[in-house]
Amino acid sequence: LLGRLAELAETSLEVPDPKFDALAGQLEELAAAARRPHKSGASSGDRKKIIIFSTYSDTVIDIHERLAKLMSTKPAGAISDYQDRIAEPQSGSYKSVHKAGKSGGVDQGGRATTIANFAPKTASRINDAGEPTGEDLFDILVATDVLAEGVNLQQAGQIINYDLPWNPMKIVQRHGRVD
């Protein structure tokens, strides 16, 4: 019986996931659109910055891992523009602690650095010369609602709600990050 359950679990991992496929398709479209000049003059780099919100830490980690794998296997094209430009998943717990099946522990310093390197113009510290200290290292940020309040991510061009929270005000808070 346990062997059969293990087989079922393995085959369920191979089943197509239409929701993830739709996310990947949306990212392709957004990256392609960011390549074209915009009438407002907004930079291509800022327009392809995307925040993907999910309610659950497990989902955030899964999305991150699957996107990283997809980007590394795709030929040169729109979604491969994001290769090596996806930040570590941001949730309310350390990724290593979460993978061990435990919860708790928030890496505030690491989160602040990631945010500053995702949106250096709006979320990083300013040095004495008036320039942002963060580097523009990331274009995709996958996060739980831990980043839905009190974080200035206005440099991002898009928000994707991978799943919807039970409280509709959470959606308003998520969208308030980019105006």
Protein language model regions, located:
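SF2 helicase motor core recognition
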Residues: 61, 126-136, 141-156, 176-178
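Short phosphate-engaging motifs
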Residues: 59, 149, 167-170
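Short secondary-structure boundary/capping segments
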Residues: 66-71, 156-159, 175
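Generic structural signal for small/hydrophobic residues in well-ordered secondary structure
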Residues: 23, 52, 153, 174-176
